[in-house]
Curated annotation (Swiss-Prot):
Forms part of the ribosomal stalk, playing a central role in the interaction of the ribosome with GTP-bound translation factors. This is Large ribosomal subunit protein uL10. Pfam families: Ribosomal_L10 (PF00466). The gene is rplJ. It comes from the Bacteria. Part of the ribosomal stalk of the 50S ribosomal subunit. The N-terminus interacts with L11 and the large rRNA to form the base of the stalk. The C-terminus forms an elongated spine to which L12 dimers bind in a sequential fashion forming a multimeric L10(L12)X complex. The lineage of its organism: Bacteria, Bacillati, Cyanobacteriota, Cyanophyceae, Synechococcales. Keywords: Ribonucleoprotein, Ribosomal protein, RNA-binding, rRNA-binding. Gene3D superfamilies: 3.30.70.1730, 6.10.250.290. Belongs to the universal ribosomal protein uL10 family. One of its GO terms (cellular component) is ribosome. One of its GO terms (biological process) is translation. One of its GO terms (molecular function) is large ribosomal subunit rRNA binding.
Amino acid sequence: MGRTLENKQKIVTEIKSLLDDSEMAVVLDYKGLTIKEMSDLRSRLQTTNGICKVTKNSLMRKAIDGDSNWNDLESLLTGTNAFVLIKEDVGGAVKAIQSFQKDTKKSETKGALFEGRLLSDSEIKEIASLPSKEVLMAKIAGALNGVATKIAISINEVPSGLARSLKQHSEKSES
């Protein structure tokens, strides 16, 4: 039984909502993947706040129509597509996709769209090599903490140095 117009409109609305919440979209050719393998991909993406959505290209076209952030996605809408919509941990989700592809050797990445720009395969791989947001924040916090510690030591050193100088001067005066 075919989908009704109302059903299709609900799907388009759902896709629009998912796209509004997403930072990046990766388009995969899922031809040849089993249901078990698709479930495996979805479970790998859950930890990174990514969603794998299989939908007709025509419905995705309607969802991105008029949205300048996602318009370039249209060039990837041919064949059998699974759309991985990534909300937060972009690097982690891309790593999960690449790990899945390495394990199954069945799906290919057709392309990705990040901040309104199509990415090449090499750019997608670069994103996967980036540390997670938490790791970057920890590095920044560590660097800031190091600077604060150095400032505190420097500020504390001035009175200590002055006190040592005065003590040495008073000891010389007494002798």
